[in-house]
Amino acid sequence: MPVYPFFIARTAAHLALISSIFCSYANGEQEHGRKANRPNFVVMLADDLGWNDIGAFGNTKVHTPNLNKLASEGMCFDQAFLTSSSCSPSRASILTGRYPNQTDAEQLHWPIPESQKIFPERLKLAGYFVAAAGKWHLGEAMRERFSVVREVDTSGFQLPANSGVGANDKFAESSSGDDRSGCSEWVNLLRERDSQKPFFLWLAAVDPHRPYEDKISARPHPPEEVLLPPYHPDTDLVRQDYARYYDEIHRLDRFVGMVLDELEIQKAADNTVVIFLSDNGRPFPRDKTSLYDSGIRTPLIIRWPSTIKPASRCRQLVSAIDIAPTILALAGFPAGPSYVGKSFTSLLEGKEAPTRDAVFAEKNWHDYEDRSRAVRDHRFKYIVNHYADLPATPPADAARSDTFKEMQRLRAEGLLPETQSSCFLAPRPREELYDLKEDPHELRNIAGLPAHGDTLARLRAEYRQWRVRTREKTPRMRTPDEFDRVTGKPTPARIRPRWSKQKMIEEGVILP
């Protein structure tokens, strides 16, 4: 039987077409399977929660049953650190996977510029339902990177808009009760999500940010039971201040429990990575905005039933900039060159090999001007204060607290010990070095001791190398304070909404 070339060619073409269709179908099924198996993500972010102010991290005096339950079902990170102890710069760093000086949002209230990439937009591009609820604090350019944004009113947590030198000390309160928690839309957003898509939720609380209300908890914390660090005075007013702070943590914990319950109701818990952390330390002097552990250490808890061993603890160093590449890796995506953090997925699997040897943090303008940097390894911390002529004034909300007023009173009476006076010290040491094993509260600066000269030189060199890697630039002028450091009154420099970094440069307020 003769074989015709035309027949052979036509048959081959049909086979190729069939093969192509089959492969396309198979690849489509494979991609569909990958999408179906991609985990969901829920990030719950506290506002001004100290790392050791929940039960799972050692403070059993605070009522946090839901966070304790989350910890018992997931992994606690005992050495997790933020890149900044200031609200918006810390959040920008988490989302961009970059250090504050790389984001152009390193000062408080500076919005994230449109040019910056944030990891939720990669998830949205891949078909995730990406939504945020609660405190926003990211700037207008980031809204379109989310499918839905439900921002709570935070006007009651700052002085009146555009208040300046003539303003009084009154707050413009516009919410009360649970609405002040910043969490009232968390569960609603989870219920109203697109059920046909994997989801990423950024749930940002306002609790336990100041100012505080009385009687917000059905089970108020007794002032006599609060745990005070040695750098705060032990007086009745300070204890009452801490008790109100504990009450707000308890309210936050209640909303965390509601989210966890809703995930169970939706049968989504098993395939959802739940991440809990705080944006900076507690809103007290020498905590929030400081580079001590009380400012930059965060109570990171991650639960993922399919992978993470329940009630496990990780003692390796982790930085907030590592969260973005880790989430992207868990979703099956490469991080890309803009993310400078390191994925720690291996730690979630229980592997103990360290992913980093040190963490780095920045202190920049937050109500008051300052510029300090820190390097921390497992045992030692090095801090360099570039504006050592200025005192380490607490942020304005902490400076208005009963705790700081007590510190001021005791200092005026000559009764405030040296260990509680660092907020008033000017000039400060140019360099600080602490042995965290021997001095966990960082009260004894050993930078000038010859016995620690090698450690000081090593960490100083690490800081200089970090500056080169991040291409950090030294500002040519200082940013004006928005409050008087003695009276706490607003200055003419206070403008709301605060200008972006670029506008401040254009207006000559700062020089980069």
Regions found by a protein language model. Give the residues of each.
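Formylglycine-dependent sulfatase
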Residues: 3, 16-432, 440-461, 468, ...
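A glycine-rich phosphate-binding loop feature that marks nucleotide/adenosyl-phosphate handling sites
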Residues: 479-483
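Bacterial N-terminal signal peptides that target proteins for export
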Residues: 1-15
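A contiguous binding-surface segment within folded domains or other stable secondary-structure elements
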Residues: 435
